[in-house]
């Protein structure tokens, strides 16, 4: 099956694009959603997170306190490394299992830190970046969350630079502040049609056996 990596900075609109591709028949695996599931109450990652970070890292409902952990990992590089060491192997296992079950015209992995990880390129046929300017990212995230501008900028600073993402891209969907919902839909549909053609060619000529990292 043709494998597409879909990425973009926070607030870029990659989830909206992924949702549309899924509606049109692609199999979509969202690694951020997997990470959320792992850190919910009784999630597979929670015992190790509690052991590493203590009870302060857990909300009253038993899920990981994302705000507390986010502040901790921004302050302490070793805390970030510890969290990644807990989550990344579990995310990889769950992603692999989901890919093996996937049914669709082609497979889309939604990976927020795809470019940063450096491990995905060899497992993908193409990388698609949903791109927008930083100010638009900030406005969108402020509108949907309680994060302050400084918090958002810290998250953005921890992600790959815009130019770095664009350099890694095989395909780009522009979703800046002037992009209407109709225009974004048209751009996503055009890309979907090109992926269908590539998927047909890919399936006729065989596919790789490797799974995601």
Swiss-Prot record:
Gene3D superfamilies: P-loop containing nucleotide triphosphate hydrolases
Keywords: ATP-binding, Coenzyme A biosynthesis, Cytoplasm, Kinase, Nucleotide-binding, Transferase
MF (Gene Ontology): ATP binding; dephospho-CoA kinase activity
Pathway as given in its UniProt record: Cofactor biosynthesis; coenzyme A biosynthesis; CoA from (R)-pantothenate: step 5/5
SUPFAM superfamilies: P-loop containing nucleoside triphosphate hydrolases
Residue ranges occupied by any DPCK domain in the UniProt entry: 3-202
Binding site for ATP: 11-16
Recorded coiled-coil stretches: none
EC number(s) on file: 2.7.1.24
GO biological process: coenzyme A biosynthetic process
InterPro entries named in the record: Depp_CoAkinase, P-loop_NTPase
Location of this chain's protein in the cell: Cytoplasm
Substrates-to-products reaction catalysed: 3'-dephospho-CoA + ATP = ADP + CoA + H(+)
Principal cellular location given in the protein's record: cytoplasm
GO cellular component: cytoplasm
Role summary: Catalyzes the phosphorylation of the 3'-hydroxyl group of dephosphocoenzyme A to form coenzyme A.
Sequence similarity: Belongs to the CoaE family.
Official protein name in the record: Dephospho-CoA kinase
